[in-house]
UniProtKB/Swiss-Prot annotation:
The keyword Ribosomal protein applies. CDD domains: KOW_RPL26 (cd06089). The lineage of its organism: Bacteria, Bacillati, Actinomycetota, Actinomycetes, Mycobacteriales. This is Large ribosomal subunit protein uL24. HAMAP family: Ribosomal_uL24_B. Belongs to the universal ribosomal protein uL24 family.
Length: 104
């Protein structure tokens, strides 16, 4: 999966189309990413015991994972781009923007 934690992405399809956000977490096995402020859902949480220190029950709004095919990485110019790879002199793999050829 070419999208990693910390990348800024643009949602290209779905109800949140056009929204930009930072990747909070990536799930490569499921091909999904958790994007800050995108795909927010309401989750019903049960009351917890007071000694556990958790918040009491109720309805909590939080982000849900979104499939990687619905997002594109935003490059340094602020444009959505596809990701390619190249190897530097040390043989290390580096991610490259397909739009402008700059390192990501």
């Amino acid at each position: 999966m070419k999208i990693r934690k910390g990348d800024t992405v643009l949602v290209i399809s779905g109800p949140d189309k056009g929204a930009k956000g930072k990747v909070i977490e990536a799930y490569p096995q499921r091909d999904k990413v958790l994007v800050e402020g995108v795909n927010r859902i309401k989750k019903h949480v049960a009351n917890s015991a007071p000694e556990r220190g958790a918040e009491s029950g109720g309805i909590v709004t939080q982000e849900a994972p979104i499939h990687v095919s619905n997002v594109m990485v935003v490059d340094s110019d602020g444009n959505p781009t596809r990701i390619g790879y190249r190897f530097d002199e040390d043989g290390k793999k580096i991610r490259v923007s397909k739009r402008n050829g700059k390192d990501i």
